[in-house]
C-alpha cells in the first residue's frame, strides 16, 4: 500500500461552543450529514458538552479528510457528503457520498484510516488515504 494523502486537524472545543451559540442549527446543518444530525440532537438532549465534542470531532475529521484529498473544500466537496460512523467496537470510519465518493474512485483510494480523539479543550483527527500501489524505496 502507498500513502497518497494525509490530513490532520485540531479543533478548539470552546470555539465550537461559541459558534453553536452564535449560529446554532445553521452551523450544525453545514457540518453534519442527516444521520449525524440525528445523533447530535440526541446527545444534545442528554448532555450538552458531549454534543459539542461530537460535533468538533466530526468537523476535525472532515477537515482532515479534505486535506488528505489535497483539495481542501473545493471541487464540489461539502462536509455533509462525509459521514463519520462507528463500527460495533467504536472505531470511527467514513461513509462518503456524491462528489466525495466519486473523488475516492478517481484517486484509486482503497484504504482510509481515521483516528479521532478529544481532551478537555481540543478535538483532533488524523486521516490517511492509501491506494494499492507498492511503496517504492529509493536508495
From Swiss-Prot:
Which SUPFAM superfamilies does the protein's record reference? Answer: 4'-phosphopantetheinyl transferase
> GO terms for biological process?
fatty acid biosynthetic process
Enzyme Commission number(s) of this protein: 2.7.8.7
Question: What are the alphabetically sorted keywords of the record?
Answer: Cytoplasm, Fatty acid biosynthesis, Fatty acid metabolism, Lipid biosynthesis, Lipid metabolism, Magnesium, Metal-binding, Transferase
Please verify whether the record's keywords include Lipid biosynthesis.
yes
The listed locations are: Cytoplasm
Q: Which GO terms describe its molecular function?
A: holo-[acyl-carrier-protein] synthase activity; magnesium ion binding
State the needed cofactors, names only. Answer: Mg(2+)
Superkingdom to which the source organism belongs: Bacteria
Q: Which InterPro entries match?
A: 4-PPantetheinyl_Trfase_dom, 4-PPantetheinyl_Trfase_dom_sf, ACPS, Ppantetheine-prot_Trfase_dom
Q: Which Pfam families match?
A: ACPS
GO CC terms:
cytoplasm
Predominant localisation class:
cytoplasm
Function, in words:
Transfers the 4'-phosphopantetheine moiety from coenzyme A to a Ser of acyl-carrier-protein.
Q: Could you say which protein family the record assigns here?
A: Belongs to the P-Pant transferase superfamily. AcpS family.
Q: Write down what this protein is called.
A: Holo-[acyl-carrier-protein] synthase
Question: Can you name the source organism?
Answer: Wigglesworthia glossinidia brevipalpis
Recite the lineage of the species.
Bacteria, Pseudomonadati, Pseudomonadota, Gammaproteobacteria, Enterobacterales
Amino acid at each position: 500500500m502507498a500513502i497518497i494523502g494525509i490530513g490532520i486537524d485540531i479543533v478548539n472545543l470552546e470555539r465550537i461552543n461559541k459558534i453553536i451559540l452564535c449560529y446554532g442549527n445553521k452551523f450544525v446543518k453545514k457540518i453534519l450529514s442527516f444521520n449525524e444530525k440525528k445523533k447530535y440532537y440526541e446527545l444534545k438532549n442528554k448532555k450538552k458538552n458531549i454534543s459539542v465534542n461530537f460535533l468538533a470531532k466530526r468537523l476535525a475529521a472532515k477537515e482532515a479528510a479534505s486535506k488528505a484529498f489535497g483539495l481542501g473544500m473545493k471541487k464540489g466537496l461539502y462536509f455533509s457528503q462525509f459521514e463519520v460512523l462507528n463500527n460495533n467496537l467504536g472505531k470511527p470510519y467514513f461513509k462518503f457520498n456524491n462528489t466525495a465518493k466519486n473523488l475516492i474512485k478517481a484517486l484509486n483510494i482503497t484504504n482510509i484510516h481515521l483516528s479521532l480523539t478529544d481532551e478537555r479543550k481540543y478535538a483532533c483527527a488524523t486521516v490517511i488515504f492509501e491506494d494499492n500501489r507498492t511503496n517504492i524505496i529509493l536508495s
